[in-house]
Curated annotation (Swiss-Prot):
Active site: 67
Gene: rnz
PANTHER family referenced in this protein's UniProt entry, alphabetically: ZINC PHOSPHODIESTERASE ELAC PROTEIN 1 (PTHR46018:SF2)
Annotated residues for binding of Zn(2+) 2: 67-68, 213, 273
Organism field: Leuconostoc citreum (strain KM20)
Quaternary organization: Homodimer.
Signal peptide: none
Name listed for the protein in its UniProt record: Ribonuclease Z
GO molecular function, a single term: 3'-tRNA processing endoribonuclease activity
Enzyme Commission code(s) on record: 3.1.26.11
Similarity-based family: Belongs to the RNase Z family.
Entry's cofactor comment: Binds 2 Zn(2+) ions.
Catalytic reactions of this protein: Endonucleolytic cleavage of RNA, removing extra 3' nucleotides from tRNA precursor, generating 3' termini of tRNAs. A 3'-hydroxy group is left at the tRNA terminus and a 5'-phosphoryl group is left at the trailer molecule
Keywords, ordered alphabetically: Endonuclease, Hydrolase, Metal-binding, Nuclease, tRNA processing, Zinc
Amino acid sequence: MQLEFLGTGSGQPSKFRNVTSIALRLLDERNAVWLFDVGEATQHQILKTTLRPRKVEKIFISHLHGDHIFGLPGFLSSRSFQGADKNEPLTIYGPKGVKEFVQTALRVSETRLSYPLVFVELTAGVVFDDKTFRVIAAKMKHRIESWGFRVEEKDHPGELLVNKLRAENIPSGPIFGQLKAGKRVSLPDGRILDGHDYVGPAQRGRVVTFILDTRPNDNIELLARHADVLVHESTYGAGEDEAKMARAHAHSTSINAANNARRAQANQLILTHLSARYIGPLLKNLVSDVRHVFPNTIVARDLDVIDVPLKKEVSVSDPHKV
């Protein structure tokens, strides 16, 4: 699992940052990529990476401001040009209006896609759930309807304790599979084995939370609780003047983001959606000003790739679920 930041700026493209789009690379987990927001020129940014548009199976749209959606029609069209077919559908999760926006752009431009396009209008709670991942959405507080997302990887089953089985002279074969599945197995010599005694502890799945355009609100902590990575908008830095601008425009400051990460007990905070003013010394200060609140903080740059590793120490009862 990796995060690739295709755009880390806010409002409009700048010389150093494109507008918002983040790829969650799940190539090992499900041979797929998920995008979170698709700002203008996202597909140009993708050309600078190893990402393949055909691998994108889901797009999550936080809200309908242009710097988060103007890249959608072009990306969808290019995905079609690059050979996506009826067996490679794409699902877009977003607020009311995203379907109308996309369909209008495709209709007016007479663009016909070669693959199925599915729309899911966001509601609070679980918006996607399968055997490997669950996605939870919650409303944010912005100038228009806006959403945050919590991506939960399902826990990984524990490993079969093969050395223990061999030490007890238990023959390999179908029995191993039954024990790994947690079943009780009767051996020819009369022994009865409980699979749970021969499987190591489950490995906790990873959690990544995306908080994009919003002012501070209680749902942020709910979505970010015990997250491995919290990706949080930081349109403005620390300071009273910045705080006033953030309140006026319904955005967050770097201090807001750090406080949210601390309260939620997240592992890492990544700041994104930066105003174009933050370059040079101001950019350095953006991080240094908040590390006393949340030390494990970094600022994303365009095309950064961040690994989200599995934890080595695991617990079946870890209360990280919302």
